[in-house]
Regions:
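Negatively charged
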Residues: 2-165
Length: 165
């Protein structure tokens, strides 16, 4: 059985450490990962296995992360409400994230803006609660089907695909 400490670390065995991220700690950990992946992995575990179930905002998390291309498809996005600028200017990222539960997200503005490599299927995303998709794919190479998306609650789609290929 694991015990959760005040800092979010949970020790399951002598070798396994799981960090339960919150809004404040996820941004710090991502910055540490960008600076030194090995050191961050020793501290938090591999980024692909991070417990993001308590995170509600991913705003600017990988903004301008030009070398980031790690698999993060196992992240629990079920409580996230804000994905603004998450991969904006992340020019190398092109990982599968189509299985994410984004059903609580209300803003996706500039999510993939200037993400010049990302072109993965995300048609299965439940975007029915999204209100803002402004410039979501602007200046990107994204070319996937989105015809199953329910965008009936979106209030702002300004420049959603501006300058896209």
């Amino acid at each position: 059985m694991s015990k959760l400490s005040k800092n979010g670390l949970s020790k399951i065995s002598n070798k396994t450490v799981i960090f339960k991220f919150k809004n404040e700690t996820i941004a710090i950990a991502v910055n540490e990962w960008m600076e030194n992946p090995e050191k961050a992995e020793a501290k938090y575990g591999h980024i692909s296995k991070w417990d993001t179930s308590q995170v509600t905002t991913m705003n600017r998390l990988f903004f301008k992360a030009t070398l980031f291309n790690e698999p993060i498809d196992e992240w629990d996005m079920s409580n996230v409400t804000d994905m603004s600028y998450m991969f904006s200017n992340a020019t190398t990222f092109n990982q599968s994230i189509g299985n994410w539960d984004v059903s609580k997200v209300t803003t996706m503005k500039y999510l993939f803006s200037n993400a010049t490599t990302f072109n993965q299927p995300i048609e299965e995303w439940d975007v029915s609660n999204v209100r803002n998709m402004e410039s979501m794919f602007s200046a990107s190479v994204f070319n996937q089907l989105l015809n199953s998306w329910d965008v009936s609650n979106v209030l702002n789609m300004d420049r959603m695909f501006a300058f896209s290929n």
